[in-house]
Each structure stands twice: as C-alpha cells, then as structure tokens.
C-alpha cells in the first residue's frame, strides 16, 4: 500500500512483470504536475525529490537547475545566465512573490569573478522547495520586467504527518520541521533554520585566504484551509549574511595575490500573505500582499605586505582600511491579484500589480586610491598602467521612492491538436516614468 499525503512528495518505484496477456491500450503519465502546458517546449518543472537528488547539486536548489534547456551555469556559483544575459536579469518569484535575491554572497566589492558571478550559496535549505518552474523565454503575460528567464519557486507547505530533522557538521547546524502547526487544526507548517560559518571549513582545508563567510537562513511557511473554498498562506524569510577578509587572510594568500580587506554585511527579509479563493465552478482568485527588505553595506580597503620584510607581525603591516564604502538599501511593499477561469474557448487569466519601492544607494571614497585592475576604457594618462580613483569622481548618492504598477489579460484557445495563447500586458515604471504595452 502507498500512503499519499497532501503537499508531500513520495518517491515510488514500480516494476512491471512480463505477462502473456494482450492489452488494448496502456496510458503512462510521467508526473502529476508539469511546467506551463501552454508555454514553450523549453519550459521545465522539477519537483521536490528531483531538486533534492540532482547530481552534483550538493542539495543546493539553484545548482540543481543546471542542465535545463537554455540555462548556462559555470558550476562555481549558485546562479545562472540565459541567452547571454547576466544572473541579475532573471525574473524570480518565491510563492508568487517577487524576490530576486535568493543566493548568498552576491558580492558588490572584491574579485571580478565574485562581483559578476551572481552569488555562491542558495538561501533555501535542502528539501525546502516543493517545486521549481523554469522558463527561458516566451512566458505568460502575467510576468514581465526582466529580459533573462523566469523562475518560480514554491516553498514546501508542510503536511499532516509531522517530521523533524537535525544536521550538524563542521560548518554549522541546520534544523527543520514539517507537519501540523499545533495551533490550528487545519493549519500545516514548514520551518527550517540554519547557521553556517564557512571560515572553519576554509581553515580546515588550508584555504584561509578566501575569508570568513557566515550566513543564517530562517524560512517559515504556514497553510491554513479556512473551508473548502478559501486558503490562507503565510511566508516569512530572513537570510542575513556577513563576510570579512582581514590581514590574516591576506597573509595566507599565495604570493599576496589578493591584498583586499573586505567587510560585508547584509540583512535580507521577505514577508508575504496569500489568500486563495475558489469562485464559481472553475474560477480561482488569488490576492497576495508582501514586504521585502534588503540592507547591504560593503567596505573595501587594501593591505601592503610586500612593503615590509617577510615574517613581519600582522599588526605591523601597513594597511589602508575603509577606503571604499558602498551602501545598498531597498524596501518594497506590493500587492498582486490574479484571477483565472475556464470558458468555452479555454482558460482566461487576468491580473493587476502595484508596488512601491524605496531605494537608498551610496558610494563613498575616503581618499585617492591607485588601482592596477581597471577597464581599458577607464581614463588615464598615456602610458600609465594604473588609474587613480578620487572622491570627487566616485562619491555618489541615489535616494528615491516610486510607485509602479502593471496589468495583464490573456486567453487560451484550445483546439483538438493545438493551442493558442494570446495576451496583452501593460507596465508603468515609476523610476523611469515609462509606460510599456506588450502583446504576447
């Protein structure tokens, strides 16, 4: 016998025996849930078990996507590129809420590969994601604003059977719970919390020059069934991180190849609530409210161990700390409403979005700084093999608050052997004061 539980994946292996009987027809369905059936053939959907057991992923949700059609991943980072676009050009939703910062250590300062790589480590613990729907292009009119790909992640919502986990290793500790909430009879909960200090790992493998990255991830989701037609979902994510690289890490660098002194601190949070309501015989109306916050400060300096004799104590090595400071603060509050129903043509979908974004960015250079790594287009005197950053040319400040909104509608026409989906989307960007109408 097989026990089937709501919102829980149960792997099952079945072997067919050879028999002499003749059967007229056998229908085999590969899976109960697939990617957008009206999207392009390159769309892909990975369930919880496939994400958890993906070869080479190391239980990292983002690395498990490697190998999907149209997706390019170097393997060194937990992010990806599509059609030559950068990792930050991808449109990412978590439980239908816009949340593009789903990886840790997406550096603003430091080595060039770290700045452009898009992050090293997913904020989601193994087994946290119930499904990942990926589309490299041609997605529904419900989505827009980015030119890369669309990735929709669904956080596990718990189940009627309680289960708990504990994992302890040299990097840190991870705990998890999935099951009834214990507060309300019709409420299930999913909770994970972990804290890792990778500095201990790098010290063990004698790679101290990397630095000391630390992270914490806390994810809580509850699903409450009010009645047969109404469901309330709550999602909370808190994922702070810290990264430091001091003079001891510089001294561990082979031949002092990297002399950067870096301090980075980031607070990342998302809170959202969704109300799903069945309307009539085939309609579904979903409303979502969310608040997300990201506050990141990055500071870079430089050490000069090559200016003193070998073996000089770390405290006596000349350094220039806090040369460059970059602040990135962004908060957003938004509302999303979607409605879908079946009609005589097929499926009709429509929705609206409204969100207010508050950004506060600044760059401050304490004093002139000679840099020997630069772009070929950076201005400098003829023959000079370095550039000099000066506060007057570097210091900047951008602080704005704007409201944006969008609306869409689309109709799917279903025929015997083919389908057609046509839609229209309107976007209004408050920062650029630009309006776009996009037929799909």
Roles of regions detected by a PLM:
Residues 136-138, 155, 168-172, 181, ...:
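Transmembrane beta-strands of outer-membrane beta-barrel pores
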Residues 5-62, 87, 95, 99, ...:
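Short, acidic, small-residue-rich periplasmic hinge/interaction motif at the N-terminus
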Residues 165, 170-195, 208-243, 263-285, ...:
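Transmembrane beta-barrel wall of Gram-negative outer-membrane proteins
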């Amino acid at each position: 016998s097989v026990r089937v539980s709501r919102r829980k994946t149960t792997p099952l292996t079945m072997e067919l025996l050879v028999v002499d009987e003749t059967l007229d027809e056998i229908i085999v369905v590969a899976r109960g849930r697939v990617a957008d059936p009206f999207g392009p053939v390159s769309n892909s959907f990975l369930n919880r078990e496939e994400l958890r057991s993906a070869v080479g992923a190391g239980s990292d949700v983002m690395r498990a996507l490697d190998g999907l059609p149209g997706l390019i991943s170097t393997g060194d980072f937990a992010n990806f590129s599509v059609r030559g676009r950068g990792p930050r050009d991808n449109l990412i939703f978590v439980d239908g809420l816009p949340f593009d910062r789903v990886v840790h250590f997406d550096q603003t300062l430091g080595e060039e590969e770290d700045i452009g790589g898009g992050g090293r480590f997913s904020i989601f613990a193994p087994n946290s994601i119930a499904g990942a729907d990926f589309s490299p292009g041609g997605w529904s009119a419900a989505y827009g604003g980015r030119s890369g790909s669309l990735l929709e992640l669904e956080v596990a919502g718990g189940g009627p059977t309680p289960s708990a986990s504990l994992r302890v290793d040299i990097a840190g500790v991870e705990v998890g719970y999935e099951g009834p909430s214990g507060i309300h009879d019709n409420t299930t909960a999913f909770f994970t919390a972990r804290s890792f200090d990778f500095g201990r790992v790098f010290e063990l493998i004698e790679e101290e020059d990397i630095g000391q990255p630390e992270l914490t991830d806390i994810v809580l989701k509850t699903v409450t069934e009010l009645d047969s037609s109404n469901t309330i979902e709550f999602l909370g994510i808190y994922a702070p991180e810290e990264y430091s690289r001091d003079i001891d890490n510089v001294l561990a660098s082979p031949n002092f190849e990297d002399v950067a002194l870096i301090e980075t601190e980031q607070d990342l949070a998302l809170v959202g609530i969704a109300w799903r309501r069945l309307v009539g015989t085939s309609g579904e109306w979903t409303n979502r409210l969310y608040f997300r916050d990201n506050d990141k400060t990055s500071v870079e300096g430089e050490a000069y161990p090559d200016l003193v004799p070998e073996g000089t104590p770390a405290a006596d090595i000349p350094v220039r700390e806090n040369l460059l400071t970059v602040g990135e603060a962004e908060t957003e509050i938004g509302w999303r409403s979607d409605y879908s129903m079946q009609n005589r043509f097929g499926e009709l979908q429509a929705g609206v979005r409204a969100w207010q974004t508050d950004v506060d960015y600044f760059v401050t250079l304490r004093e002139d700084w000679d840099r020997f790594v630069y772009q070929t287009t950076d201005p400098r005197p003829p023959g000079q093999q370095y550039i000099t950053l000066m506060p007057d040319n570097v210091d900047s400040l951008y602080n704005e608050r704007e409201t944006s909104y969008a609306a869409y509608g689309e109709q799917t026409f279903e025929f015997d052997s083919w389908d057609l989906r046509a839609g229209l989307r309107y976007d209004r960007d408050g920062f650029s004061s630009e309006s776009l109408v996009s037929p799909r």
